[in-house]
Swiss-Prot record:
Pathway info: Glycan metabolism; osmoregulated periplasmic glucan (OPG) biosynthesis
Protein name per UniProt: Glucans biosynthesis glucosyltransferase H
Gene name as annotated: mdoH
Biological process annotations from GO: glucan biosynthetic process
InterPro entries in alphabetical order: Glucans_biosynth_gluTrFase_H, Glyco_trans_2-like, Glycosyltr_2/OpgH_subfam, Nucleotide-diphossugar_trans
Membrane-crossing residue ranges in chain numbering: 140-160, 194-214, 513-533, 570-590, 615-635, 656-676, 680-700
Lineage: Bacteria, Pseudomonadati, Pseudomonadota, Gammaproteobacteria, Enterobacterales
Length: 842
């Protein structure tokens, strides 16, 4: 069999179609497939002429009429996006320095963000009503939190052992020995630090407690006068003038899972009869060439399977500016003015058609709503860690989400996905300028969602949580280490966002959102410092003699005090704040029915196991988050390169590498405290033994086998597992289908396989006009690539080749026309197996 025959056999043609092609040489095959009979001055450009024919052979049902167009040089191009209609979207520079703003005001250059009234008088009255209610509620929350914190801090002060602060006179210490003064002050300095940290941490816990409590009451009563979901009855027809874009920004994601969830979502939309009101945009920032080719293939298959021509679009950016927020901004600039609303989806998002239609109805019923955030439910994971987290978010999450809505109303959170956004105000107000200055807290904003919500509210638009709208789903990280990688990014992003705390015009609620975002991670080093100071105080108490006389001529000694009854009362009160929300959550399930959670016994046992699991993980997260915060402030780059693994489980080697320092700290801490005072070790036991067990918990909890066993036992069961909605059933079905036909080593197949080469060539985006300089550069790229082995061709060079239709055509022609000359490429490709289901043959 000669090379031409092999080439023809690689195409998805019937025997009759193959027999009709010439067997003389590769160029003749391409010329025969070119119905326009174009003449190319270079023979290695001949594959460009057959692109259309090869695409129609492989994906005949994916190409809409007129979708294959000509670029400026007459090359075939697959039009994967609609025609752009550009809008202007530019950010205002941040003024984070209040002194600078004061100087601007003195010079008459201060610009106050304006509230543009878009509402009728009646709508303005309703708007003012809920804003007033929200303000009153938040003052009540502040009062409750501060009062609770003051009482708890006073109790804490009374139970600390050293009560002689008032007797210490700095003037009396001047003449005495320095060491004596130091030893007199040390326990009181430690106690003061402990007291301050306790107050901050207790205030943080108290705010969460009141949020959960109000959420419990909201869900128990079942009626919410100010719920945005109450503004519609749920069956109003959608306005055909207001179209919605479903946009999914992705970057090097699991292609099979992305397109399975997207297909299930789109089919659910079609089932509602509202598909004409929606379009889908897959916005790729992927820079792995293999994944890029797999995305293109999956997009073609998706269009064919759901008849999505003209409604499902795909774009891969070559210039990945500002990450996800920049990807969304690029969409808004090019196509945003074609839509009234857009729904942002994550790579793991799945939403029902009813939920999406409901979000659109809410937007139409509330003309001053800028963002409406759904409350996504976690599901779809099998590891013990993920199933435990799924259960926790499913059981406790509704309380906190409803509580957030109660306190915030239309000045709420936006989590960056599974939310609908009004496009016009987003374009006008939500472009993000880089933070000024230098260092780790300057540059492009990482956690864009909170900032976009704050800017939307600053412009006068509402930001709501539709906490009671069903049909929104997401997935969680499969194991602890994967979650911590995500937390590292979120930690840095939230610390950056705090620079916007004093930016002019921000609503107080969103200033509080920035503060709570920081405290989500800053609480970890504060807790660690609290434990460290408590340990240090115990060391001082055990190893030094107390200073009984703190003043000259003091008649009575100051005895260290220990009031165990108050300590136990304070400890019990703190535990109530921490664990009562969990108890309220399970009580709510007991009241409304436990069948979907496995029954009364199993859901209660699952709760107890989850509490134990959270106790084991809390100190581990504390230390990791402490490292993340310190690294961010010091400008260190936290490198986290995990070994490649075929499943979600954590290898023992990686576990000990990541948790080894925690295990060592736990051992040293436990031994030290046992030597000093066994009674103090009792109080520290949940901390130190969690650290000692951290590698083992990390590994065992990452195992799917353990997670699936708990599923068979109906532990950590959630309603989405007991009675899965159709959209999740479809996602699993399409995921299995996609796994069977998955495409690995996409770049090499795009070089060798005729069909995938045609697809890559047609979707390449670097379509420059011909020039001598460009031709020289192309030849250099191709020659350098072919003169090396494929293993030495790095990711960036592969991307350059993949982005240019001419280089892909020339690579394809040369490796087939001169296999002896480029034997290293041919031999490498022969070692790669093309999944026989990846390309359907006739």
């Amino acid at each position: 069999m000669n090379k031409t025959t092999e080439y023809i056999d690689a195409m998805p043609l019937s025997d009759i179609e193959k027999a009709a092609l010439p067997k003389t040489d590769i160029r003749a095959v391409h010329e025969a497939l070119d119905v326009e009979h174009r003449a190319y001055s270079r023979e290695d450009d001949s594959p460009q002429g057959s692109v259309k024919a090869r695409l129609e052979q492989a994906w005949p049902d994916s190409l809409a009429e007129g979708q294959l167009i000509k670029d400026n040089e007459g090359r075939d191009q697959l039009q994967a996006m609609p025609k752009a209609t550009r809008s202007s979207m530019f950010p205002d520079p941040w003024r984070t320095n209040p002194l600078g703003r004061f100087w601007d005001r003195l010079r008459g250059r201060d610009v106050t963000p304006r509230y543009l009234s878009r509402l009728t008088k009646e709508e303005q009255e309703n708007e003012q009503k809920w804003r007033t209610v929200g303000t009153i509620r938040r003052y009540i929350l502040l009062l409750l939190t501060l009062a609770q914190t003051v009482v708890a801090t006073w109790y804490m002060k009374t139970i600390l052992p050293y009560q002689g602060w008032a007797l210490i006179n700095p003037a009396d210490m001047i003449g005495q020995d320095l060491w004596v003064s130091f030893m007199q002050l040390l326990p009181y300095v430690l106690q003061t630090g402990i007291l301050i940290l306790f107050a901050v941490l207790f205030c943080w816990v108290s705010a969460g407690f009141w949020t959960a409590l109000m959420g419990f009451l909201q869900l128990l009563i079942g009626r919410d006068k100010y719920s945005i979901s109450a503004s519609t009855v749920g069956n109003e027809p959608l306005n055909p003038e207001h179209r919605t874009a479903l946009i999914m920004p992705i970057c090097n994601e699991d292609v099979d899972r992305v397109f399975a969830g997207l297909r299930a979502t789109w089919e659910s939309v079609k089932a509602t009869g509202n598909a004409a009101h929606f379009d889908v945009y897959i916005l790729s920032d992927s820079y792995n060439p293999d994944i890029c080719v797999a995305e293109q293939k999956a997009w073609m298959e998706l269009i064919a399977e759901v008849q999505g021509e003209g409604q499902i679009f795909y774009r891969r950016r070559r210039r990945r500016v500002k990450r996800k927020s920049g990807n969304i901004d690029d969409f808004c600039r090019r196509w945003g003015n074609q839509y009234s609303y857009m729904v942002v989806l994550d790579a793991d998002s799945v939403m029902t058609g009813e939920c999406l239609s409901g979000l659109v109805r809410l937007m139409e019923a509330n003309p001053n709503a800028g963002i409406i955030q759904s409350s996504p439910k976690a599901s779809g994971m099998d590891t013990l860690y993920a199933r435990c987290q799924q259960f926790a978010t499913r059981v406790y999450g509704p309380l906190f989400t409803a509580g957030l809505h109660f306190w915030q109303l239309g000045e709420s959170h936006y989590w960056g996905h599974n939310a609908i956004i009004r496009v016009k105000p987003f374009i006008e107000h939500c472009a993000l300028a880089p933070l000024p200055g230098e260092g780790s807290f300057a540059g492009s904003i990482l956690s864009h969602d909170f900032v976009e919500a704050a800017l939307m509210r600053r412009a006068g638009w509402g930001v709501w949580i539709a906490y009671d709208l069903p049909g929104s789903y997401e997935e969680l990280p499969p194991n602890l280490l994967d979650e911590l990688k995500r937390d590292r990014r979120w930690c840095h992003g939230n610390l950056m966002n705090f620079r916007l705390f004093l930016v002019k015009g921000m609503h107080p609620v969103h200033r509080a959102v920035f503060l709570t975002g920081v405290m989500s991670y800053l609480s970890a080093p504060l807790w660690f410092m609290f434990l460290a100071l408590s340990t240090a105080l115990q060391v001082v108490h055990a190893l030094t003699e107390p200073q009984y006389f703190l003043q000259p001529r003091q008649l009575f000694p100051v005895w260290p005090q220990w009031r165990p009854e108050l300590a136990i009362a304070l400890f019990a009160s703190t535990m109530v704040l921490l664990f009562l929300p969990k108890l309220l959550s399970i009580m709510l399930i007991w009241c409304k029915g436990t069948k979907e959670y496995g029954g009364f016994v199993r859901v209660t046992l699952s709760l107890l196991l989850e509490v134990l699991f959270s106790v084991l993980l809390a100190p581990v997260r504390m230390l990791f988050h402490t490292v993340f915060v310190v690294s961010a402030f010091l400008g260190w780059e936290v490198v986290w390169n995990s070994p490649q693994r075929d499943d979600d489980s954590t290898p023992w080697g990686e576990a000990f590498m990541r948790h080894g320092s925690q295990l060592l700290l736990g051992l040293v801490w436990a031994v030290g405290m046992a030597w000093l005072d066994l009674r103090f070790l009792f109080w520290l036991a949940p901390i130190v033994f969690s650290l000692i067990l951290s590698p083992f918990v990390s590994v065992v909890s990452s195992r799917s086998t353990v997670g699936l066993r708990t599923k068979r036992w109906k532990l950590f069961l959630i309603p989405e597992e007991y009675s899965p909605p159709q959209v999740l059933v479809d996602t699993d079905k399409y995921l299995a289908m996609n796994r069977n036909r998955t495409l690995d080593d996409g770049f090499m197949h795009a070089v060798f396989n005729p069909s995938f080469n045609a697809l890559a060539t047609a979707m390449a985006t670097a379509r420059h006009r011909a020039s001598k300089v460009l031709e020289i550069a192309r030849d250099r790229h191709v020659e350098q690539a072919l003169n090396e082995t494929p293993e030495k061709l790095n990711r960036d060079r592969r991307l350059v080749l993949l982005s240019d239709p001419v280089t892909m055509a020339r690579l394809h022609y040369r490796v087939w026309n001169s296999p002896e000359r480029y034997s290293s490429w041919v031999n490498y490709y022969q070692g790669i197996n093309l999944n026989p289901l990846a390309l359907q043959k006739k």
